[in-house]
């Protein structure tokens, strides 16, 4: 691999961040090229190219990703998720739920059915209760990053697209709230259901406070800056980066805080947003990093027989729960059965949020 190829570098450079930085810089450039070629020659979304490239690099033995994630790698993953969820939250209008409250009911039914289907399956496979609960929470999460990237690449629009993004955003909100609360309970050594509920309220409260502060700061900045200027993009990214750095130490979830910040911002300024072009470029690079990292980690996991079959069973149970819940609640929420089926399919992918929660659970179990 590239890591071996640069082993001849002088000792001074070996101790500097140069080699690892060079590896990741080249990986991101090649991943972007792979995504471009996939879309150009097949018409498929670029994320397929990112995922295939990341998988190939992982199988080739690239050693640039430590597990569980920590340090700069963990921060960059959280930052990438935070930027995506901020944009997803800014698309979500609470007025929609007042006009069609069944959308919120639909999201709750789908999340609960997915959680219990995954939990019961994992308990049937004789996994311990804490492990089954953690993996069931991870199963609830969808992937707004995948959806929004596919929507951007294919220029998709319509009721199915809007509903899928809304439900994926809400699923992520539930998963981050419950998952972060479980992590706090593990840290305190109290994993009872009552402790988890109290922790969920605390995590949601702290994240909402930080998110509201972020939204207020952005509203103030937007009064001084042109919405599509380069300076606006810098301010948005800098404040999201600061939010990502401080929320977890305060007891909240950084991605959850930015998601809530986007929702609050949408309520404060409900007009349609035109995001700065520079923000889209920065977010695209973070997206490439996330998809490569997720694929790389998945390729390097220890997929021996029992784990592989358990993972496949969990994926099947999760898919069945999501599709069934959408088909049951779709007509009452204004979707046809065909539209409900496609929304359910759109909620099946799992990506960076699942990787983040899994890494945090592994780190907590080892501490």
Cite the ranges covered by each PLM segment.
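Transmembrane helical cores of multi-pass secondary ion antiporters/exchangers
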Residues: 1-367
């Amino acid at each position: 691999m590239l890591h071996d190829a640069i082993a001849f570098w002088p000792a001074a450079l070996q101790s500097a961040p140069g080699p690892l930085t060079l590896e990741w810089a080249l990986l991101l450039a090649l991943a972007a090229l792979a995504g471009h070629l996939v879309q150009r020659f097949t018409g498929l979304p670029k994320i397929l190219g990112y995922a295939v490239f990341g998988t190939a690099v992982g199988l080739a033995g690239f050693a640039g990703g430590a597990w569980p994630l920590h340090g700069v790698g963990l921060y960059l993953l959280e930052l990438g998720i935070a930027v995506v969820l901020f944009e997803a939250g800014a698309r979500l209008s609470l007025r929609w739920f007042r006009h069609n409250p069944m959308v919120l009911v639909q999201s709750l039914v789908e999340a609960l059915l997915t959680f219990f289907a995954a939990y019961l399956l994992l308990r049937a496979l004789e996994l311990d209760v804490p492990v089954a609960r953690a993996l069931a929470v991870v199963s609830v999460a969808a992937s707004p990053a995948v959806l929004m990237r596919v929507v951007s690449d294919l220029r998709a629009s319509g009721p199915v697209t809007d509903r899928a993004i809304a439900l994926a955003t809400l699923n992520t909100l539930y998963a981050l709230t419950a998952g972060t609360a479980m992590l706090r309970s593990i840290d305190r050594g109290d994993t009872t259901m009552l402790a988890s509920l109290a922790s969920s309220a605390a995590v949601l409260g702290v994240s909402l406070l930080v998110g509201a502060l972020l939204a207020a700061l952005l509203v103030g900045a937007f009064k001084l800056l042109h919405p599509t200027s380069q300076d606006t993009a810098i301010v948005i990214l800098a404040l999201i980066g600061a939010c990502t750095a401080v929320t977890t130490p305060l007891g909240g979830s950084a991605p959850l805080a930015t998601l809530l910040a986007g929702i609050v911002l949408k309520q404060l300024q409900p007009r349609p947003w035109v995001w700065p072009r520079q923000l889209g470029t920065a977010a695209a690079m973070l997206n490439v990093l996330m998809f490569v990292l997720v694929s790389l980690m998945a390729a390097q996991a220890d997929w021996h027989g029992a784990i592989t079959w358990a993972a496949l069973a969990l994926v099947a149970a999760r898919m069945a729960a999501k599709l069934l819940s959408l088909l049951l609640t779709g007509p009452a929420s204004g979707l046809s059965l065909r539209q409900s089926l496609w929304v359910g399919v759109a909620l099946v992918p799992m990506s960076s949020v699942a990787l983040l929660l899994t890494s945090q659970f592994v780190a907590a179990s080892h501490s």
